[in-house]
Amino acid sequence: TDNVVNVSSDLRNLRMIKTSVELAQIKESAEIHTEVYKRIPSLYIKGMTDLELQIEIEREMRLHGSIGIFRSFGENMDIFMGSLLAGDNAQAASPFDYALGGEGISPILPLGANGSILKSGTTIMIDMAGNYRPYMDDMSRTFSIEQAPDTAYFAHEISIKIHNSIKSFAKPGTSCSDIYNTALEIVKENNLEAYFMGTGQQAKFIGHGVGLEINEPPVFTPRSKETLVAGMAIALEPK
């Protein structure tokens, strides 16, 4: 037993920095995932439920090569290939540290779509794991059924502003906590604190690493001690 050493933290640190081959796999997966997402509007049929739309998206993902598994780092978590949240269901609290949870279709798994009919004015957030290669991507996109409320459009524009702001200064050596705090400052400037990263339950992060799993380190939190390093692959998702 004297020769047994726990190297879990060393492996986590090693996996944070991707090789060129690993980055290429993430890029390929994201490119396929993008093509699937482009098809989402054509998958919608008037009168269908959120669950029915999610099933159609999952089918499209499988046809494009997804292995159909959502692998998440550091949590004993059950989920499908991702999450589709529509309307008020997005405000249902999650048992996990998520910005948006959803009731699900059963207490067995209180997460995600709950069978709500997609009506005019409903906003839909689709957050799915692109598992088309051994190294995954994580992609969130927002849609609306016909016309969305003005508040939703405004919040979406602020989300894009946060993305662009962080992209303008994030580089090797940038503190992950500074990235979170920059996002929060923009949110406060636009009086959206009540909606930032959830309503009933607000998550305390705006992004994370991706690789063999979703939610790998680094994680962008107010107290994160990590800094960006060349070769990291991250999902930036202020909501």
Spell out what each predicted region is.
Residues 1-239:
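Active-site neighborhoods and metal-handling regions in enzymes and metal-associated proteins
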